[in-house]
């Protein structure tokens, strides 16, 4: 018996039949014998009031029963469907107070603004799930003269007296400490909780559950409207529900699937686009019984023909310079949440589509959508991976024709040239034995989430360039996630493959010999160095780079990206580049040199794994491994010897320092 698992959740279950769907999935798990195996029942998750609380508030507002409305770090004017008319109904409160950290749509409607401290500037706690209690403490002084909302409420309680007199703590930190008495009874326990960032209790034993027979309604969910398409609003991969819409790092980070940046788009299936003669970038109007939106069309082969989809997160009328007046808000098309379940009706509306005969180019970073036989994002079936086959051996086993990449004469010439190159480098400091830094990237673990990309922005002071420059192909991200489509033809399933692409730190780097001022050079430990003070901006290195991972500063991006106080986020260990300078991935050389310096001070050798690059540190699936390839026992050296390993564009003889591990395909043939 092999345990299975049925799961309900995500956007697909956000409709008026959501509760019935969850019940049906629970029944399926019980019938399949999964209860007690892959499904266990323990402590309930902590939950808020949900939509029921919103309904009570709206009823009280309509009845004129709200004297003071305090809204703390929430933006219901934007985050609720426009059909609820929360903006108009909140005006019925006699006095409205906002304690937001941003001037958002809700704050703009309030009578008093009390800016709250940022989460990095204040004390706080959280209970995200049963048994987990997070404890937050400030890591920096407040940048602006705001006050902790807790301190404001404590001051108000002391002045009001009466039932509020029990809140007598002089400040919120003291109140928080007293509230944690039950969890951290003494000073030692409190300090331990601070050091760990909270309290993480041992999960309770799974409760014994005996499924019993039950009945429930299974009516077909009703839809608002009678349009030809079902509309699906889904959280943006980076902006989520709109809370990240004023962060340029997230706006300029391409969506993993569409590779679109900055502004939202409207997805429709490729077949629907062909039938209606709609091309990418054509502005279409989507109309529902509750409202309408306008946006550029984005045909997508992975979408159902009867569905139109759009990401949440855009369409703000306030919230900051980067979020304001950018795109549309899909919530304008939706009705009220289901009163019984409280689920947002993300899949409960039928819409009509109209052409506007206007055009808006979608700012994408997509190159070629398919590999075109270049072997960039390799994959190997599980049956061959289990046998320890290489990608080439697996292709032979499947009957693919093998093409000779280089003739015997060419191979001899290449090998002889390389030997001369290596011998020629053995001068001065290059004659000594040094580490050889390298990386492996496991494509079976990479999900295309782009956490590595954002980490690289933060670590290396990379500027954002804006939508107009992205349209011109001038993005500055040192690391990009390339997405290639496989299949999707003749009934084959459509598959997306993701490949993190960065400077390969080639041993035979084509960028180095073409630089007329030796700004691009090879370091003793195998890195392709870049001397910014030497660079005169000829861009020859970029033209000669086989992987297109060098980026040129066309403007003074740094001046626009970090006006005060945003300059506080800059990494002091990394130079901020100016206009006319070429830049690229350095394998976080500042981290390498810092670790080497610390090891020298402690009179010892560098230890494998004691430091890593920002991208490897941020990867949630541990797809990236960094280390010294010359150390045969290092994790990177061992993983690079995996039979699945290959180098991108290996036939060019650039000898990259990055080894990719082919994605394992676990398919069940019909």
Label each region the model flagged.
Residues 338-670:
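Non-ligating segments of multi-cofactor redox enzymes
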Residues 83-104, 138-157, 283-289, 296, ...:
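Phosphate/diphosphate-binding loops
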Residues 10, 24-27, 31-34, 57-64, ...:
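Generic, well-ordered alpha-helical scaffold segments in large soluble proteins
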Residues 148-170, 175-178:
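Non-catalytic, well-ordered alpha-helical segments in soluble enzyme domains
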Residues 15-21, 84-85, 539-540:
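Short glycine/threonine-rich loop-to-helix capping motif typified by GTGT followed
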Residues 1-61, 183-190, 194:
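Active-site phosphate/pyrophosphate-binding segments
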Residues 43-144, 161-162, 176-477:
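A cross-kingdom feature strongest in bacterial/archaeal respiratory oxidoreductases
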Residues 2-7, 35-41, 66, 129-138, ...:
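Short acidic (Asp/Glu) and glycine-rich catalytic loops that position anionic groups and cofactors
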